[in-house]
Design a protein with these regions (language model features):
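Alpha-helical membrane-anchoring segments
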Residues: 2-398
Length: 398
């Protein structure tokens, strides 16, 4: 086979991979939407607040949210079913980006990654058979996500809190001598992810990288599926495994092929958003969920203490998540978010403050609601600290 024939074969393979990728991506988004549907349209009796990125943005009417969400679903069906989905993918990206602006909680890690991949598909001219650039941009994004996901987990909270909590159902069945090895074995999780991210970008170690990535997703599913935890990430893990198999096939190229060749390119955007910007999260300059920090133990955590009067006024779905406390009840914001939206709370001070304000509207006195935010230490300066605010203090801080 001469060089021209080889290039044509590579282009044809890339186009087939791009078509398969768009179908998997659209199905993954549809599954994510279905499992977190209350996040995407207004439901009667919802207490958890919508938090726009900009305060000047108006509240979206419930009827508009249904139409907006329906349009996104229709566009995904068209992306999956049409041979040339560029216009539908571009429309989806535009509508989805605008929709996220009206509620920070919608910027979930899985949605952020899917949105970039849809942008890559929208940027590709489907009349051109060479789809290698969008595929390489998506591949670079996937590798960076593994790398930073592992890096974010290199903190004490992950080993002492996250791992024991997730593994508890299995550890309870093991002898105490083996259960003590949890922290040691937990160290393999971030190392596996970091190695997977690096190996996927090399020809020599790619097979090992693919294997490590697949093992990671199988392990996550074993921790979550049998115990019905956070089911919105189930399709994300299945889709991520599929992305690895599609994007890192034998002819995917070496590390140089994944790096940008032009300043203005999809690969440059992938490198900036997923390769460089996550480093800023360790300085508090970039979002944790935009830096693959889900289940890392490296995000600020918020809890509320509410009085009996406030507890009695909560929706039943939220009331079931209350835990007894010395003064009233405690409510973890993640439990609240799962109860109403089926997604974890977006970790930002603005979201925490707005959630506290929603509870304060049910209070009779400022002390009926207290917000407690525990901020972990940063890698580069900044120690762990706890901030506690009641309803009066929240009014001053806003």
């Amino acid at each position: 086979m001469n060089e021209t024939d080889a290039r044509v074969t590579d282009e044809e393979r890339a186009l087939k991979d791009a078509r398969l990728l768009k179908v998997v991506l659209a199905l993954a988004l549809l599954c994510g939407f279905a499992l977190s549907r209350r996040l995407w349209y207004s439901t009667p009796g919802r207490l958890y607040p919508s938090v726009p990125f900009f305060d000047f943005l108006p509240t979206v009417a419930p009827s508009v949210t249904y139409v907006w969400f329906g349009a996104l679903v229709v566009l995904l069906v068209l992306v999956a079913s049409r041979a040339r989905p560029r216009a539908y993918a571009a429309a989806f990206v535009a509508l989805a980006c605008a929709y996220v602006l009206f509620d920070e909680s919608r910027l979930q890690p899985w949605f952020y990654q899917y949105l970039f991949m849809m942008l890559a598909l929208a940027a590709h001219s489907w009349r051109d058979k060479d789809a290698r650039e969008p595929l390489r941009a998506c591949a670079l994004m996937v590798a960076c996500v593994y790398f930073w996901s592992g890096t974010q987990k290199l903190n004490p909270h992950f080993f002492t809190e996250v791992v024991p909590s997730l593994a508890a159902p299995y550890l309870s069945r093991l002898p105490a001598s083996l259960a003590r090895l949890t922290t040691t074995l937990g160290a393999l999780i971030p190392l596996t992810e970091i190695c997977a991210g690096l190996m996927l970008l090399t020809r020599r170690w790619r097979r090992a990288g693919v294997l490590l990535a697949l093992i990671t997703h199988a392990f996550v599913l074993l921790l979550f599926v049998p115990f019905r935890r956070n089911n919105v990430i189930w399709p994300w893990n299945v889709a991520s495994a599929a992305f690895v198999l599609i994007l890192f096939r034998r002819g995917a190229g070496g590390a140089r092929d994944f790096l940008p060749r032009k300043a203005l390119s999809l690969q440059t955007l992938a490198l900036v958003l997923f390769g460089l910007m996550p480093a800023l999260s360790f300085f508090g300059l970039w979002g944790q969920y935009l830096s693959s920090a889900l289940y890392s133990g490296n995000v600020a955590r918020a809890q509320f203490t509410v009085s009996e009067q406030v507890a009695g006024r909560l929706p039943p779905r939220v009331r079931s998540k209350l835990m007894p406390a010395d003064e009233g009840f405690r409510l973890d914001i993640n439990h609240w978010s799962y109860a109403e939206l089926n997604v974890p709370a977006y970790p930002s001070e603005k979201v925490y403050a707005r959630a506290a304000a929603a509870l304060c509207r049910l209070a009779e006195s400022p002390s009926d609601v207290r917000l407690e935010v525990n901020t972990p230490p940063r890698f580069f300066g900044g120690s762990a600290h706890t901030t506690t605010l009641d309803c009066d203090a929240l009014k001053v801080s806003r």
